[in-house]
Amino acid sequence: MYNVLDIERAGDWIGVCEGELDTLTLSKCVGIPCVGVPGANSWKKHYTRLLADFERVFIFADGDAPGREFANSLAKELPVTIIGFPDGEDVNSAYTKYGAEFIREKAGIVDV
């Protein structure tokens, strides 16, 4: 798991995404506390325990089959809200095209 220090700075909720660059984009550019994994298939069972106390976990799912499968598998383990992106898009491409406010609004997070 990447960027675990954001677990400490997060309040009642946290974001999870796939890829280090997307994680940093959410955390540093968009202002959403976030942890990430290197790829959709790299989630370890013990990561769930690190996030179990959050009221809500926002999964920022890449716009591809592995990204959607990753989000749906976490939804079976945690209280998640899945924030999906169109085919071929992810956090970083959306940030580059539309900006931070677009991502915050997509997630319904306005108090960052």
Report residues per predicted region.
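TOPRIM fold recognition
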Residues: E8-I14, L21-V112
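Charged, flexible boundary elements
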Residues: M1-L5
